[in-house]
Amino acid sequence: MRINPTTSGPGVSTLEGKNLGRIAQIIGPVLDVAFPPGKMPNIYNAFVVKGRDTAGQQINVTCEVQQLLGNNRVRTVAMSATDGLMRGMEVIDTGAPLSVPVGGATLGRIFNVLGEPVDNLGPVDTRTTSPIHRSAPAFIQLDTRLSIFETGIKVVDLLAPYRRGGKIGLFGGAGVGKTVLIMELINNIAKAHGGVSVFGGVGERTREGNDLYMEMKESGVINEQNLAESKVALVYGQMNEPPGARMRVGLTALTMAEYFRDVNEQDVLLFIDNIFRFVQAGSEVSALLGRMPSAVGYQPTLSTEMGSLQERITSTKEGSITSIQAVYVPADDLTDPAPATTFAHLDATTVLSRGLAAKGIYPAVDPLDSTSTMLQPRIVGEEHYETAQRVKQTSQRYKELQDIIAILGLDELSEEDRLTVARARKIERFLSQPFFVAEVFTGSPGKYVGLAETIRGFQLILSGELDGLPEQAFYLVGNIDEATAKAINLEMRSNLKK
């Protein structure tokens, strides 16, 4: 981290004593730059090209050094469009890697890969910046205790708990509730853990990024009146941007998250949507730099690039970064090198089901497909583990019986199976929950449910103590006491109708 003079922009220093080179070749987003003998820059140094194109328009392009070619030339990748650049234009070596603003000034704002605000809300305080390239924390700094990161979301905490400082893969198609789940997690970490969140939009649609921003403002995650009270910083490098920007935007978001962890000593949530696009951008850059492709056309450095990003996401003695990464699986092929490399780093998977979303059960987290390495008796305790396993067994049995029910009907089942189905349907509905960020749409107040309350609720359903309550009483409630109260209300209403 460095303190810049107030006049400097993110990652761009003054001209005094700076290395100057000239553009020797332009091939799309790749620029070759020639320097005087003995003035070669370092790998990952940021370059700035300023000038005017033939139409007199101002040009300001930032590049990053990728290769030293010999003959006093370097090969760089541009972070923005190279339209209007010409051979012979002057290039300024900033003498340092790309640096971005960090700290409280970033909350409530949208940035590009360079750390420049793109939300038309004025300049950002750039006195404190940090380089996007840095080493992962040393072993001695790591906090290796296995601890659960409580989210207040019943289905997640019970069946696929998140690890503090862990990495979670979020799988789900369009329209099943990924955005709302992400916003609820951002809201809950701020309330329960006093933490903040950083959202990295890597290579996804601009429209989706805009929708997320608008929904965050509507739900109060971003406070327009007082940005300092916002709970999230947004960093976007969308589909239409050059591969260099899409490859580095994840590091920009991670750098902002690291400051909150290391300096502010907070628990941070880092969202990356989509981690596959990070790999895809790296593949494009690799091809542009002339490297020999590896399996299925991916870059030969795939594992190294993924590792350099993922190993920085961890818990230290100061704080933690817990990362939730949306994972696109090309052609649903889990053996594709991109998702396969990602899986090696994940501690948990949260799978969203279209079938549950169609039933109106939100969050639509699939209780059988979602997994976690934390769901072990020695980590979560015997009580939690046993309850989770019994919930999964009951749900699995219900799934197996659904074909029989569809063909023959519920009456053809044995007494034991009918009881299992009734409890499974209650469990399915009790796994739903009203969200704080959805209050503006549903009119129902959101609920944060502690882990102990969650376990108690499911134990009561499994024990049969609540067999007499109607299924509807368990739908969109917080803890089990609310379900009991709802059942009494439903009974009173039905009596009044009679």
From Swiss-Prot:
GO cellular component: chloroplast thylakoid membrane; mitochondrion; proton-transporting ATP synthase complex
Subunit and partners: F-type ATPases have 2 components, CF(1) - the catalytic core - and CF(0) - the membrane proton channel. CF(1) has five subunits: alpha(3), beta(3), gamma(1), delta(1), epsilon(1). CF(0) has four main subunits: a(1), b(1), b'(1) and c(9-12).
Record Gene3D superfamilies: 2.40.10.170, Bovine Mitochondrial F1-atpase, Atp Synthase Beta Chain, Chain D, domain 3, P-loop containing nucleotide triphosphate hydrolases
Enzyme class: translocase
Keyword check for Isomerase: no
UniProt-recorded Gene Ontology molecular function terms: ATP binding; ATP hydrolysis activity; proton-transporting ATP synthase activity, rotational mechanism
GO process terms (BP): proton motive force-driven mitochondrial ATP synthesis
Topological relation to the membrane, as annotated: Peripheral membrane protein
Annotated protein name in UniProt: ATP synthase subunit beta, chloroplastic
Record: residues binding ATP: 172-179
PANTHER family reported for this sequence: ATP SYNTHASE (PTHR15184), ATP SYNTHASE SUBUNIT BETA, MITOCHONDRIAL (PTHR15184:SF71)
Subcellular localization, as worded in the UniProt entry: Plastid, Chloroplast thylakoid membrane
UniProt keyword list: ATP synthesis, ATP-binding, CF(1), Chloroplast, Hydrogen ion transport, Ion transport, Membrane, Nucleotide-binding, Plastid, Thylakoid, Translocase, Transport
InterPro entries from the UniProt entry: AAA+_ATPase (IPR003593), ATP-synt_VA_C (IPR055190), ATP_synth_F1_bsu (IPR005722), ATPase_a/bsu_AS (IPR020003), ATPase_alpha/beta_chains (IPR050053), ATPase_F1/V1/A1_a/bsu_N (IPR004100), ATPase_F1/V1/A1_a/bsu_N_sf (IPR036121), ATPase_F1/V1/A1_a/bsu_nucl-bd (IPR000194)
Catalysis: reaction(s): ATP + H2O + 4 H(+)(in) = ADP + phosphate + 5 H(+)(out)
Role description: Produces ATP from ADP in the presence of a proton gradient across the membrane. The catalytic sites are hosted primarily by the beta subunits.
